[in-house]
């Protein structure tokens, strides 16, 4: 437990130190965010805010891993791979947006191909590692499903879902950062309670790095995480849950991610089928914005909801074998 606390503090400080160094550099090289014209009017003033800020918490996390552990475990290495690999895809996407001076980087099929490649690599290594295998645990009922040959296709779909859902959540200052900070704290506790101490330390590191990044990303944001950050966070949330054999619990603790993704699916589906919109704008955080809610109120309420969902997540695991709080 003391190593977890130490890891949080180190990652937090490293993240804080990087802000004053990297943010001016992003300004200098004009790595500013292009705001989509169809977005909320209040977001227009954010145009030019530096993006790619996800590199702050990615670098902080990687540095801290090697500060606190000279020989990272297999689980830590796989989590770092997911974190960095998905982050690189986001970095490419962000770079193209800046080069083209538009809010469109990689084409949808290009991004999906890259996501599928990384997801396949992770799924293959997880499937062939005896400590992970092809089993997943079902929350509440505590039954184990062995997916066998369907495990890798499931993991590919799963990572496509988590990365895109977190990406959609990153639409307000501090929103994706706050939600994922809470989710990673949840996984740190679960990892510790199940004896996965290396993973517990890694989750603590990411949580600490996000806490430091929040100083620069909270309203009014000095920097956006960009796709660099949101895809990396979707990847690391997915990887940690996968290694705990708890990918299904993301549906519970990541309920905000799910709501954001579903709101887009429902909005698009309704408009194509009925010619009518369900929400004023999607993802759903924009609906609340256009309903008169301030960004900070939305972030606060969504964070409170996530705390409640994490408590429900703990309840769903209480009687699981090997789980002890």
Swiss-Prot record:
One cellular component (GO) term of this entry: plasma membrane
GO biological processes: cell division; cell wall organization; peptidoglycan biosynthetic process; regulation of cell shape
Magnesium as UniProt keyword: yes
Pathway participation: Cell wall biogenesis; peptidoglycan biosynthesis
Example GO molecular function: metal ion binding
Domain of life: Bacteria
Keywords: Cell cycle, Cell division, Cell membrane, Cell shape, Cell wall biogenesis/degradation, Magnesium, Membrane, Metal-binding, Peptidoglycan synthesis, Transferase, Transmembrane, Transmembrane helix
Enzyme Commission numbers on file: 2.7.8.13
InterPro entries hit by this protein: Glycosyl_transferase_4 (IPR000715), PNAcMuramoyl-5peptid_Trfase (IPR003524), PNAcMuramoyl-5peptid_Trfase_CS (IPR018480)
Transmembrane intervals: 3-23, 48-68, 79-99, 106-126, 136-156, 174-194, 199-219, 223-243, 246-266, 298-318
Coiled coil: none
Membrane topology: Multi-pass membrane protein
CDD domains assigned to the protein according to its UniProt record, in alphabetical order: GT_MraY
Names of required cofactors: Mg(2+)
Catalytic activity line of the entry: UDP-N-acetyl-alpha-D-muramoyl-L-alanyl-gamma-D-glutamyl-meso-2,6-diaminopimeloyl-D-alanyl-D-alanine + di-trans,octa-cis-undecaprenyl phosphate = di-trans,octa-cis-undecaprenyl diphospho-N-acetyl-alpha-D-muramoyl-L-alanyl-D-glutamyl-meso-2,6-diaminopimeloyl-D-alanyl-D-alanine + UMP
Subcellular location: Cell membrane
Enzyme class label: transferase
Cross-referenced PANTHER family: PHOSPHO-N-ACETYLMURAMOYL-PENTAPEPTIDE-TRANSFERASE (PTHR22926), PHOSPHO-N-ACETYLMURAMOYL-PENTAPEPTIDE-TRANSFERASE HOMOLOG (PTHR22926:SF5)
Function: Catalyzes the initial step of the lipid cycle reactions in the biosynthesis of the cell wall peptidoglycan: transfers peptidoglycan precursor phospho-MurNAc-pentapeptide from UDP-MurNAc-pentapeptide onto the lipid carrier undecaprenyl phosphate, yielding undecaprenyl-pyrophosphoryl-MurNAc-pentapeptide, known as lipid I.
Protein name: Phospho-N-acetylmuramoyl-pentapeptide-transferase
Organism of this sequence: Clostridium novyi (strain NT)
Taxonomy of the source species: Bacteria, Bacillati, Bacillota, Clostridia, Eubacteriales
């Amino acid at each position: 437990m003391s190593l977890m606390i130490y890891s949080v503090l180190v990652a937090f400080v490293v993240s804080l130190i990087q802000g004053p160094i990297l943010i001016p550099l992003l300004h200098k090289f004009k790595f500013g965010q292009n705001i989509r014209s169809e977005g909320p009017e209040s977001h227009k003033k954010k145009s030019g805010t530096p993006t790619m800020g996800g590199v702050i918490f990615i670098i902080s996390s990687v540095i801290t891993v090697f500060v606190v552990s000279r020989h990272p475990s297999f689980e830590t290495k796989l989590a770092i791979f997911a974190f960095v690999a998905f982050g690189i895809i986001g970095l490419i996407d962000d770079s193209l947006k800046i080069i083209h001076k538009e809010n469109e980087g990689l084409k949808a099929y290009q991004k999906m191909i890259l996501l599928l490649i990384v997801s396949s690599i992770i799924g293959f290594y997880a499937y062939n590692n005896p400590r992970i295998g092809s089993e997943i645990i079902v929350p509440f009922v505590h039954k184990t499903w062995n997916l066998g040959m369907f495990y890798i296709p499931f993991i590919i779909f799963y990572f496509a879902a988590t990365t895109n859902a977190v990406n959609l959540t990153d639409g307000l200052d501090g929103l994706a950062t706050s939600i994922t900070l809470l989710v990673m704290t949840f996984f740190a506790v679960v990892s510790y309670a199940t004896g996965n101490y290396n993973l517990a330390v890694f989750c603590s590191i990411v949580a600490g790095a996000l806490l430091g990044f929040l100083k620069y990303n909270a309203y009014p944001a000095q920097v956006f995480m960009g796709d660099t950050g949101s895809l990396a966070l979707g990847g690391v949330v997915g990887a940690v849950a996968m290694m705990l054999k708890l990918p299904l619990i993301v549906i519970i603790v990541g309920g905000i991610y799910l709501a954001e993704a579903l709101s887009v699916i429902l909005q698009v589906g309704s408009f194509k089928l009925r010619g009518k919109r369900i929400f004023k704008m999607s993802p759903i955080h924009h609906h609340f914005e256009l309903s008169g809610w301030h960004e900070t109120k939305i972030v606060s309420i969504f964070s409170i909801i996530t705390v409640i969902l994490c408590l429900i997540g703990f309840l769903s695991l209480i009687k699981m074998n090997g789980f002890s709080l």
